[in-house]
Amino acid sequence: MRVGNIRDLVNYAFMPRMIWIGLAGFAGTLLRYWLSGAVAKRYGETFPYGTLAVNAFGCLLAGALFYLMYERFLTSPTVRSMVFIGLLGGFTTFSSYGLQTFTLLRDGELLLALINIAASNVAGLFLVWIGYRLAGLV
């Protein structure tokens, strides 16, 4: 491929990584659909058991894979992006929140971790309410 300008270079360099991230995200989305459906079928839908199971399992996977990919086996940025942005991002974004908060705690940033916890929960619930109210105006 002949690269004519910086945009071509950027597109050429990142396209394979983006494709792998997208495929991993597709797999994560299918896993989320399957697991949340299986749990909801088993335990009912009076409580969001399926979502809770996906979020909890996603956090477990995020912690384990973070250790394995950063501490035990050094993996390439593309593989890490596939796993954390693609697979786990498609599976649950709550795992990103959990992993980022854990990293702050591990690095001794207790105040930032607490701010992240409070802001994510308060802002998240508040913005769901705002979105609900705004949609009701349409």
Predicted features along the sequence, with ranges:
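Membrane-interface helix-loop junctions in multi-pass transporters/channels
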Residues: 2-138
